Regions:
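NTP-dependent small-molecule kinase module
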Residues: 132-168, 172
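A glycine- and Lys/Arg-enriched "phosphate-lid" helix/loop adjacent to the NTP-binding pocket
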Residues: 93-140
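The conserved Walker
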Residues: 9
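Conserved, aromatic- and glycine-enriched, well-ordered alpha/beta core segments
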Residues: 167, 176-251
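Conserved lysine of the Walker
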Residues: 13
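A charged, amphipathic interaction segment
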Residues: 231-312
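Conserved substrate/cofactor phosphate-moiety recognition/catalytic segment
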Residues: 18-67
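Glycine-rich phosphate-binding loop used to anchor ATP phosphates in small-molecule kinases
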Residues: 51, 55-97
Length: 312
């Protein structure tokens, strides 16, 4: 698992990173964590930045040294160095009021401030800086983070908040046709599918996903035809795979963390379905319109490998 988290100050990056680390530790999977504040600023000096080259070198060293990690921060350039290692990219944007409230309620951060009093004295400056996120054009702005998100070709999700209900929120926005086209990524498809299978079971999930994807495509100005839009066999295959995945998951792990585990594994590979079904068959008009049985292998995670890695 490799995850990079970006967003405004107060968006919940550190909190989400902590939740991920705790969930992985509970599952006996060690994972390293890097707060980019610790490499962006000179140690022991308030608001004295390090050279971009030195900070970038530290990020690269961290990412290359650890197999499993979480990197979080508001520094677009530094997160950009982390995404070179193909992590899951999480962009958190809860809105300015939520960020301001989180900053006001933030506990003392000893790695940034000598005391809680010192931190509180700088609160008004921080709040002003948080408000400026939406209008600035620098490396630490909404504009920079959006550009990073949109240009990244790996697995990515844009979240409305960091709470453990972020997946509920994404599923609700899917059902309301309120997920913008640029945010309806491969990763979003997968975790929304997982949420539906977890909530409704495979059969009802397929019905709801079929209707929801068709409506969302149309809300984006797309069409569902014999050559574009909703694909029945792809959706049905993923529903079966996700149901098997959930059967093998730790039941004491929250569904949002199981979703991140899913994205970190081989089942999230974009071409994984070709392990079960030939390209010509899966990309056919018939497969788009109705269910076609796979022609290469039965849909069985335990019995299937993808590039030498077991899917089970």
């Amino acid at each position: 698992m490799r995850i990079a988290i970006v967003g405004n100050s107060g968006s919940g990056k550190s909190t989400l990173a902590g939740q991920i680390v705790a969930a992985q530790n509970a599952a006996a999977h060690s994972i390293a964590s890097l707060d980019l504040d610790t490499v962006a600023w000179e140690p022991g000096k308030i608001a004295v930045g390090r050279s971009p080259e030195a900070a970038a070198a530290d990020v690269a060293a961290f990412c290359s040294t650890h197999d499993r990690w979480v990197v979080e921060g508001c520094y677009g350039m530094l997160v950009g160095h982390a995404v070179a290692y193909s992590p899951i990219l999480l962009f958190i944007d809860p809105g300015v009021e939520a960020c301001l409230a989180n900053c006001r309620n933030r506990p003392w951060e000893p790695h940034k401030y000598a005391s809680k009093t010192d931190q509180d004295e700088k609160l008004e400056f921080l709040l002003s800086w948080v408000r400026g996120y939406y209008t600035r054009v620098d490396d630490l702005s909404l504009r920079a983070h959006q550009a990073l998100f949109e240009s990244y070709r790996g697995l990515k999700l844009r979240l409305a908040h960091h709470q453990t209900t972020w997946l509920d929120d994404l599923a609700a926005r899917f059902q309301a046709c309120a997920v913008p086209a640029k945010e309806w990524t491969h990763a979003a498809h997968l975790v929304v599918g997982l949420w539906h299978v977890h909530r409704y079971g495979a059969a009802e999930a397929l019905d709801r996903l079929r209707n929801g994807i068709r409506r969302l495509n149309e809300s984006h100005g797309g069409v569902n035809t014999t050559t574009n839009g909703y694909h029945e066999t792809i959706t049905a295959m993923y529903v079966q795979l996700l149901a098997q995945y959930l059967d093998r998951c730790r039941t004491d792990m929250a569904i949002d963390m199981r979703a991140l585990d899913l994205l970190a594994g081989p089942l999230a590979a974009r071409d994984v379905l070709f392990t079960f079904c030939s390209r010509d068959r899966l990309m056919s008009t018939a497969a788009r319109l109705e269910w076609l049985e796979p022609d290469l292998a039965p849909i069985d995670l335990e019995a299937t490998t993808y590039r030498g890695v077991s899917l089970g």
